[in-house]
Amino acid sequence: MNTESLALDFKSATLYAIRVVLHDADTTRLRAALDKRMADAGSFFENEPVVIDATRVDAPVDWPALLQALADHNLPPIGVVAEDANLQGARDAGLVPVELSTPVARAPQVIDTAPPNDVATPVPSVPEATAEAAAKAGPQDDEADGEQADEAPAHNPESVPTRAARETTEANRPTATPPQSSSALVITKPLRSGQRVYARHTDLIVIGMVSQGAEVIADGNVHVYGPLRGKAMAGARGDTSARIFTTQLDAELLAVAGVYRVVEDKLDRALHNQPALVRLDGDTLRIEALKG
């Protein structure tokens, strides 16, 4: 056997990344838009790999300035989709052209919700391994509401246009579907401001309050049996069939498969502080009341 071949090997890999879609080539406008998006999203997208999609702009992009703007927000670019002169400019700036494909949503499944431990283990960022509950914060201000949410959507849907250019994509064609866990991650303690929990390859169930400033993230569905006052993201790896369920909706930010809404104003009375679900309808985020 050739011992030199043991030093390394080549394997196929699937990489999930943020797709930053440019609608303008003006550096000032791009930086302002990026600043606002990141301020709205908090730490959701920090340190996530980025693929820049410049196919919608004809004007030349200032690639060094754009790359610096992304770096300032801890968004490392790993590739580009562009055409003609912009493609060459991106190459000159050190970007690698990539092909994008859309991930297939997983089929709905019955989740065994037997809890592991009450407290999840730390994780660096959204798409990394294991579950996370990080950072200390101030006191909680309410008790958890244990009322179960009925998953059948009722009336009073609120249609929300896409706010972000995050589309979870694949830089390479996948060779296998990521494994789905047989049980959901269950958290039975309220989450305080500054805490984050991430359920990898499964659903997340929080029995208690998610305070303002806390974040709950899952590759599958997010269930909050209590007031949801922080940020919630379902389908973190691009599962467009994922949903968010809560018995009391009062969130700062809602996201499914990267399509998100910052809740700057109070929701409709039929939704605010009521049982609700959040789902994707094409590229539109819908918030719907749940009837008991």
Swiss-Prot record:
GO biological process, one term: regulation of cell division
Low complexity bias spans: 128-137
Polar residues biased stretches: 171-185
UniProt keyword Transferase present: no
Positions of the UniProt region annotated as Disordered: 107-186
Pfam families per UniProt: MinC_C (PF03775), MinC_N (PF05209)
Gene3D superfamilies (alphabetical): 2.160.20.70, 3.30.70.260
InterPro entries reported for this sequence: CAP/MinC_C, MinC, MinC_C_sf, MinC_N, Septum_form_inhib_MinC_C
Keywords: Cell cycle, Cell division, Septation
Entry keyword annotation includes Cell division: yes
Acidic residues: compositionally biased ranges: 140-150
Subunit relationships: Interacts with MinD and FtsZ.
Task performed by this protein: Cell division inhibitor that blocks the formation of polar Z ring septums. Rapidly oscillates between the poles of the cell to destabilize FtsZ filaments that have formed before they mature into polar Z rings. Prevents FtsZ polymerization.
Protein family per UniProt: Belongs to the MinC family.
Protein name: Probable septum site-determining protein MinC
GN (gene name): minC
